[in-house]
Amino acid sequence: GASTSASSNSGTAPPSPMIRKPYLLFLADAPDRNACKTAFGVAFWRPHECVGELRYPEAKTDCGTPAMDVREAARRGAKTLLVGLAPSGGAFAPRWIETLLEALDAGLDIASGMHVRLDSVDAIKDRARSKGRTLHDVRLPPPSIPVGTGRKRPGKRLLTVGTDCNAGKMFTSLALEK
C-alpha cells in the first residue's frame, strides 16, 4: 500500500516502507466481529506480531489479545497502530482521530485499510509530519507498481475473488500461505 512519510510534502507517496512490527490492533467501538475482520485476521494468522489490542469499553468484541492503551503498547514495543476495523461509510469517527493522534504522539506509525486516506485528515497528517511518523494507507497501491503485461513471471500466484467484502478471501489466502 501507499505510505505517506512525515518528511514528504508532495501529493505523491514515496516508495512504500515496510509497516513496522509489532502491532497494536485498534478495534475502537467495534459492534461485532465482522466489523473488525482485519484485526481478527492479523491476530489469528500473525499473533506473534501483535502486542495487544485497543478497544473502547462499548466494543462488543475482542481478538483475544491483551487489552491495553496506546502508552502501554508503546512500552511493550508496539511500532504501528493497525486500524483493524472498517465501519459502514468508511470514515474515521472524531473519537478515533483522537486515539490515532495519541498513537502518533507515543511514537507509533499508523496503518489503515479504510477507504478514507489517513493523510486526508489534516490533524493526522500534520501530527504525523511533526512527529516524524509514517502513515500507511494499505488500500492504495504504491506508484511504483508496473502495469501488467500478461507475460509469464517466476513464482506462483493465486487470485482469490469474492462477490462481496465478506467472502473470506484474506483467510483463504493466508491459510494457503501457511
What are these regions (language model features)?
Residues 82-86, 112:
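Redox-cofactor binding/interface segments in oxidoreductases and associated redox assembly factors
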Residues 39, 70, 96-100, 177:
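Generic hydrophobic/aromatic pocket-lining and core-packing "Φ" positions
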Residues 99-101, 105-157:
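Extreme N-terminal, non-catalytic leader segments
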Residues 2-10:
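Low-acidity, Ser/Thr- and Arg-rich intrinsically disordered low-complexity segments
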